[in-house]
Regions:
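Membrane-helix boundary connector in multi-pass membrane proteins
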Residues: 94-111
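N-terminal signal-anchor transmembrane alpha helix
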Residues: 10-24
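Mid-chain, well-packed structural core segment of small domains
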Residues: 64-98
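Alpha-helical transmembrane segments of multipass membrane proteins
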Residues: 23, 63, 96-100, 123
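Interfacial loop at the N-terminal end of multi-pass membrane proteins
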Residues: 4, 8, 26-51, 70-73
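Hydrophobic core of alpha-helical transmembrane segments in multi-pass integral membrane proteins
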Residues: 53-67, 118-123
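Membrane-water interface at the C-terminal end of transmembrane alpha helices
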Residues: 118-134
Length: 134
């Protein structure tokens, strides 16, 4: 298996964990101190619960783009993924900066390494050459 495919699968697995965390927040898990700058320690308000569901959907959409670009899944997205993967890289870079700068020590400890791994995987997928079909 190529590095590109492994990076894409790694991105998708990590993204599934991030999405599960967001869904748990939306469902009432008391982990608000570990998300969104720790502005809402404990349970999320109804508005933040909606935001968590939206974030989970966006994370999985980005995973789909990365998987498509690597040729792992969603072949119908292949052409669009050529440029969308760079949007995923940009979002990953911003996410890493924000997670390093957050006032929440817990969020920084947990999510900065996750953001780094997501950024690294997306850069690998975006920059590695497409291998020919076998």
């Amino acid at each position: 298996m190529s590095i590109r495919r492994m990076a894409a699968i790694g991105y998708a697995v990590i993204s599934a964990g991030v999405a599960a965390f967001q869904i748990a927040l939306a469902a009432g898990a008391p982990w608000g101190a570990y998300a969104m700058g720790g502005v809402s320690p404990g349970h999320y308000s109804p508005a933040l619960r909606v935001a968590a569901v939206v974030q989970a959907a966006l994370v999985m959409l980005m995973a789909g783009v990365v998987l498509s670009r690597a040729g792992v899944a969603l072949p119908a997205w292949s052409r669009t993924s050529r440029w969308l993967v760079w949007l995923v890289v940009a979002v990953g870079a911003v996410s890493l900066v924000l997670n390093l700068a957050t006032p929440s020590a817990g969020e920084r400890l947990v999510w900065a390494p996750v953001a780094f791994l997501l950024l690294a995987c997306s850069v690998l997928v975006a920059t590695e050459r497409q291998e020919p079909e076998e």
